[in-house]
């Protein structure tokens, strides 16, 4: 082992130490969160060593030391793939998690189980790193399921609330659907290729059938909340804000996109799979951008922006630019984590108020948070020379110049424009204007835990894109020439979005809507998707099963089939054999009438 692999091992050991310490008395110490946060910061510093070595040498490494098991001829080893993707993603994930943990020490300080919370956050990070560095599908599946179960525990952290429990259950159920696809792909590779090692899969068969790729796409759809399996993502906002920040920036939701990036050697030879990914991503990015326009919960707006960016990453994979999608994952982590931390800062300061209509004027009372939120929103829209610009602009350029579906490109451009609209809406509602919150609320953002964490991410949101795009050489040939109007398309649609938002803001001061528009209802009710999937379909299933149980089974089997049939047979037999009908009441009545007639005649 050399310095490259040794420093990676040291980073992992440092991260595991607080987990081991949780089985001792240290876990009961009030300083445990500080230990966890410090461990992550040390792990980040050490993880820079292999990353810098990789940047200097561009030498990938695969570490495979421990033979796990052999099932017939299928050999499983614990192997780590230290390549372009894992070496670049690991320090970014550690840096973002370090900032989120420092923020959590301020945000969750009054929580009685804060030590357990930090332990869960750390386990969440470790499972994501297992997923990123895995060199075989089984190891990747362990990390995949790990982030799933940790997200369930963290989204449902405030388990006394019904909404939190429902959201956690929703997240795990939607991910179960995706996991079916992953398991089907595992089974196909085991049966047909007899291996789960990534290198062997890529070498053995490049012209692979669509079936395992469909399984992988289904898995990515569930984990990365693409259209159809997306409702769990906004619901996941019921968890604490640090959980939302970690979930949306560098863990969980990017795992699905990362899976497809890992398998790009198979996808690039299958145009059907690429077209499917492109269309799925384009629909997702537009639909979620439309939903974000009318939301009033600040965290849900940021959550829908995540889903929209995930759709953009899927579009990038669909046009066969996996390295560009990965670059967007890396740049997106910084400003998305910062947007959530700024939202958490505002929510905490306003006594857990999340409605942007009840905010306003925060640039006066919370200047630091307001500045960071503005930087994050501008980076999200792809403002030139902020972090988001370096990946988003390239994605739009690549989509413009690729032989792709024109509708997918138009949809992506509209969604990019809408990103600017809802980002500006947050700034207008939350930061500008007059305060709309109670005057008695005391606002104080002068806490080093809060300021330092947001400050680091703000610096990342400004400089990280420039550093990443300049340090890492592209693995494919970029477009050398391009007309000016195509080059400026991304900037043009973003500025158009800002202009629309400004105009809408001016109009909203004077316009009074008498009735709600159906388009507004469609956007505000999330396309009626949750209502249909979570209310109408379960109700129809329940009523159908109830009718089947009561009407079909009970009435047919326990009433008509046996008792009624037996009685009908007995009656038919008795009437056939006997001349008497057995009508006792009629006999008594005729006897009474004849008796009365006789008495009447005699008297």
Curated annotation (Swiss-Prot):
| Protein name, as recorded | NADH-ubiquinone oxidoreductase chain 5
Q: What is the main EC category here?
A: translocase
- Work out whether the entry's keyword set contains Endoplasmic reticulum: no
Q: What EC number(s) would the UniProt record show?
A: 7.1.1.2
One GO cellular component, as annotated: respiratory chain complex I
Q: Write down the chemical reaction(s) this protein catalyses.
A: a ubiquinone + NADH + 5 H(+)(in) = a ubiquinol + NAD(+) + 4 H(+)(out)
Which gene underlies this protein?
MT-ND5
Q: How does it sit in the membrane?
A: Multi-pass membrane protein
Transmembrane stretches in the record are 3-23, 38-58, 87-107, 114-134, 138-158, 171-191, 201-221, 241-261, 273-293, 301-320, 325-347, 366-386, 409-429, 457-477, 482-502, 582-602
Write out the annotated subcellular location: Mitochondrion inner membrane
Q: Which Pfam families does the UniProt record give?
A: NADH5_C (PF06455), Proton_antipo_M (PF00361), Proton_antipo_N (PF00662)
A GO molecular function held by the record: NADH dehydrogenase (ubiquinone) activity
Query: What is the protein's known function?
Result: Core subunit of the mitochondrial membrane respiratory chain NADH dehydrogenase (Complex I) which catalyzes electron transfer from NADH through the respiratory chain, using ubiquinone as an electron acceptor. Essential for the catalytic activity and assembly of complex I.
Chief localization: mitochondrion
Q: Which family is it part of? A: Belongs to the complex I subunit 5 family.
- Name the species this protein comes from: Oryctolagus cuniculus
Q: Which InterPro entries match?
A: NADH_DH_su5_C (IPR010934), NADHpl_OxRdtase_5_subgr (IPR018393), ND/Mrp_TM (IPR001750), NU5C-like (IPR003945), Proton_antipo_N (IPR001516)
Under the heading NCBIfam families, the entry gives: NDH_I_L
Q: Which biological process, per GO, is one annotated for this protein?
A: electron transport coupled proton transport
Q: Which UniProt keywords apply?
A: Electron transport, Membrane, Mitochondrion, Mitochondrion inner membrane, NAD, Respiratory chain, Translocase, Transmembrane, Transmembrane helix, Transport, Ubiquinone
Q: How does it assemble?
A: Core subunit of respiratory chain NADH dehydrogenase (Complex I) which is composed of 45 different subunits.
């Amino acid at each position: 082992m050399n310095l490259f692999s040794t420093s990676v091992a040291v980073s992992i050991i440092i991260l595991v130490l607080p987990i081991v310490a949780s089985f001792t008395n240290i876990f009961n110490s009030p300083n445990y969160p500080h230990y966890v946060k410090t461990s992550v910061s040390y792990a980040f510093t050490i993880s820079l060593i292999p990353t810098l070595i990789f940047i200097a040498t561009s030498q990938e490494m695969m570490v495979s030391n421990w033979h796990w098991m052999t099932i017939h001829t299928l050999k499983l080893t614990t192997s780590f793939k230290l390549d372009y993707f894992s070496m670049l993603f690991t320090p970014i994930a550690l840096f973002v998690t370090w900032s989120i943990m420092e923020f959590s020490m301020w945000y969750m300080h009054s929580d009685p189980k804060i030590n357990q919370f930090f332990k869960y956050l750390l386990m969440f990070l470790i499972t994501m790193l297992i997923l990123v560095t895995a060199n075989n599908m089984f190891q990747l599946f362990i990390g995949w399921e790990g982030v799933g179960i940790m997200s369930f525990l963290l989204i449902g952290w405030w388990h006394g609330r019904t909404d939190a429990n429902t959201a956690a259950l929703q997240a795990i159920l939607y991910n179960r659907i995706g996991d079916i696809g992953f398991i089907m792909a595992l089974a196909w590779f085991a049966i047909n290729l007899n291996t789960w090692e990534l290198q062997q899969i890529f070498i053995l068969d490049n012209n692979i059938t669509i079936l395992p790729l469909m399984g992988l796409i289904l898995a990515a759809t569930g984990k990365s909340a693409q259209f159809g399996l997306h409702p769990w993502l906004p619901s996941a906002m019921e968890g604490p804000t640090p959980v939302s920040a970690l979930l949306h920036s560098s863990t969980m939701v990017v795992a699905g996109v990362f899976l497809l990036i890992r398998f790009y050697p198979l996808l690039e030879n299958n145009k059907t799979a690429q077209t499917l990914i492109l269309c799925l991503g384009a629909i997702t990015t537009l639909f979620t951008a439309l939903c974000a326009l009318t939301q009033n919960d600040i965290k849900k707006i940021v959550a829908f922006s995540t889903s929209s960016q995930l759709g953009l990453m899927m579009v990038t994979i669909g046009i066969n630019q996996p390295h560009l999608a990965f670059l967007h994952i890396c740049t997106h982590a910084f400003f998305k984590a910062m947007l959530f931390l700024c939202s958490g800062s505002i929510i905490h300061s306003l006594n857990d108020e999340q409605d942007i209509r009840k905010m306003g004027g925060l640039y006066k009372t919370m200047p630091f948070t307001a500045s960071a939120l503005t930087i994050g929103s501008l980076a999200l829209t792809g403002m030139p020379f902020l972090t988001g610009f370096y990946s988003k602009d390239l994605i739009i350029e690549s989509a413009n110049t690729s032989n792709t579906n024109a509708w997918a490109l138009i949809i992506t451009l509209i969604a990019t424009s809408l990103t600017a609209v809802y980002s500006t809406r947050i700034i207008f509602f939350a930061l500008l204007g007059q305060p709309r919150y109670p005057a008695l609320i005391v606002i104080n953002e002068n806490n080093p835990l809060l300021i330092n964490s947001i400050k680091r991410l703000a610096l990342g949101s400004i400089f990280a894109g420039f550093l990443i795009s300049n340090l890492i050489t592209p693995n494919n040939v970029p477009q050398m020439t391009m007309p000016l109007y195509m080059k400026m398309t991304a900037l043009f649609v973003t500025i158009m979005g800002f202009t629309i938002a400004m105009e809408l803001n001016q109009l909203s001061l004077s316009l009074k809507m008498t009735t709600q528009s159906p388009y507004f209802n469609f956007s505000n009710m999330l396309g009626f998707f949750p209502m249909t999937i979570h209310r109408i379909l379960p109700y129809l299933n329940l009523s159908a099963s109830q009718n089947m149980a009561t009407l079909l089974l009970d009435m047919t089997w326990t009433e008509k089939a046996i008792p009624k049939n037996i009685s009908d047979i007995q009656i038919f037999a008795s009437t056939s054999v006997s001349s008497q009908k057995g009508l006792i009441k009629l006999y008594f009545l005729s006897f009474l009438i004849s008796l009365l007639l006789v008495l009447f005649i005699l008297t």
